[in-house]
């Protein structure tokens, strides 16, 4: 089975993949100082929660935005004699039309790959994580950029840490915009205000993408993902076609399948390009030692 790993600033998310289907997923807090031993123990423990072990894993597909943990994951793969595919601008089987492709986060590229294959193009992915990321995919499947805003929980934390009297609050949908105490006022500002930020930026991005791609705005697929995408603040957004919390794991699965020549994935009709990343990926196996 394939082990898909999404290493974010807040969480490490694992997906256990059989064939091309995610059969289990787990999430743990990110520790940027983890050693190979610690990460191996974490992964092994999460696998055991679903009755699996490292002996069931045939390869690892990883997207990491934490450079320190990228190398640690590589060390774990070497130790376990597993093939490892690291998502990056160099391993993406799609055009990346931005000024500096190497600066684009691996998770953003993987999401762009997944949305094109699974939902069609043109498309916008909104990823609710530590940061909220908006990523655009052109009609031909190319990644063409996006926007990054502070994440919802980051805003809550900043209010608590950077002010003298504002408390940490629970993220919940307020009953009204006009709060009658500090907590309800903060919930209004954070949740309703955050939704307004998302909708406003999404509308502007959709308008620009529609103009560039010469399509009606209704043709642009909008997909939400990320650890906070299942919250009430996300469900209340207008103009969203799908909420897919496992989009990144699915993208890592697709990337692996393409790199290994899966006919089912390579023949996907949803975008204007097809092909394999084989030959450009960083693979570690027993033969390389």
Predicted regions and their residues:
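ATP-binding/phosphotransfer module of carbohydrate and carboxylate kinases, centering on a glycine-rich
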Residues: 2-4, 30, 158-289
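Short glycine-aspartate micro-motif
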Residues: 2-6, 59-61, 123-127, 221-223
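Short glycine-rich phosphate-binding loop at a beta-alpha junction
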Residues: 54-65, 83-84, 213-227
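Short, polar loop motifs at secondary-structure junctions
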Residues: 68, 90-91, 226-230
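Phosphate-binding/catalytic loop of phosphoryl-transfer enzymes
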Residues: 74, 81-162, 191-206
């Amino acid at each position: 089975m394939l082990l898909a790993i999404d290493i974010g600033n807040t969480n490490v998310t694992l997906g256990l993949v059989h064939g091309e289907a995610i059969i289990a997923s787990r999430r743990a807090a990110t520790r940027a100082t983890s050693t190979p031993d610690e990460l191996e123990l974490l992964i092994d423990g999460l696998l055991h929660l679903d009755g699996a072990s490292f002996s069931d894993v045939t390869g690892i597909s990883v997207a990491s935005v934490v450079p320190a943990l990228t190398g640690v994951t590589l060390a774990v793969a070497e130790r376990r004699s597993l093939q490892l595919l690291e998502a990056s601008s160099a391993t993406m089987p799609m055009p990346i039309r931005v000024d500096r492709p190497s600066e684009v986060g691996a998770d953003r590229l993987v999401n762009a790959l997944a949305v094109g294959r699974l939902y069609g193009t043109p498309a916008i992915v909104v990823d609710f994580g530590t940061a909220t990321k908006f990523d655009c995919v052109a009609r031909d499947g190319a990644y063409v950029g996006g926007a990054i805003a502070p994440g919802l929980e980051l805003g809550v934390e900043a209010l608590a840490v950077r002010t003298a009297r504002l408390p940490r609050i629970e993220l919940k949908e307020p009953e009204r915009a006009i709060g009658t105490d500090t907590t309800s006022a903060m919930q209004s500002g954070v949740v309703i205000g955050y939704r307004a930020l998302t909708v406003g930026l999404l509308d502007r991005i959709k308008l620009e993408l529609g103009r560039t791609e010469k399509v009606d705005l209704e043709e642009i697929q909008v997909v939400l993902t990320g650890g906070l995408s299942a919250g009430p603040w996300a469900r209340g957004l207008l103009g969203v076609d799908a909420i897919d919390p496992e989009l990144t794991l699915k993208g890592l699965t697709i990337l692996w399948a393409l790199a290994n020549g899966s006919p089912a994935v390579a023949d996907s009709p949803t975008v204007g390009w097809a092909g394999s990343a084989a030959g450009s990926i960083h693979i570690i196996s027993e033969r390389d030692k």
